[in-house]
Amino acid sequence: MSRIGVRSEEEVRQVLDALNECPAVKLTGAFMHFAAADGDEAFARKQFDTFMRLTAPLPAGIVRHAAASDASIRFPWARLDMVREGISLYGCPGVQSGIPLRYAMSFETRVEFIKTLPAGETVGYGRTWTAPRETRVATLGVGYGDGYLRSASGKAQVLIGGQLCPVIGRVCMDQILVDVTDVPGAQEGDCAVLMGRQGEMEITPDQLAAWAGTISYEVMLSPHPRVPVLYYEEGK
């Protein structure tokens, strides 16, 4: 990946020489990272073979690891002494594996306010959305200041009352607007799921990422520290 590390036997020797001059520093392991574990296996194998060749001179007993989530699933030959499970711990299937993963994270907020707009009324900054009919609009207490990506403006949907509701207008710093005309039972205080399951419906990290033009890793890392975090075990 050309980020950090060594690329040749000579560089390995330089590192070992430097370590020999620092007796307080003990070499305990070596690792690599696949550039495209979800892509061309031939290139991944080439990376792996290079890693094994360069680490061959290292002291016996060190820990070698190469495989993160996708590689640990696709490439059994790359598991070595340990694996680095990351996104798979969140239940996201980076590659099609047949493993029945369950999403471990949701992102939720509440309906703060509901109003009815006449046809032709515009909403939000820049007036980017115009009501095509009389429309019930819910204001939700979340925005890009909370980590709900602004790039999802006008494309994302949320779950209210077990139904998908489109985000309308631009995502604001602290609020978003949602069309709840087709959810007549929606009311202030209702839970709105931005990412996660509600009833029989689910918005996955990959789906939210597609709306925002990014990847699932980013949407799962986006919630701001000001967003309360609740941890559940066995539903409690």
Language model features with spans:
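Active-site loop/helix belt of alpha/beta enzymes
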Residues: M1-A119
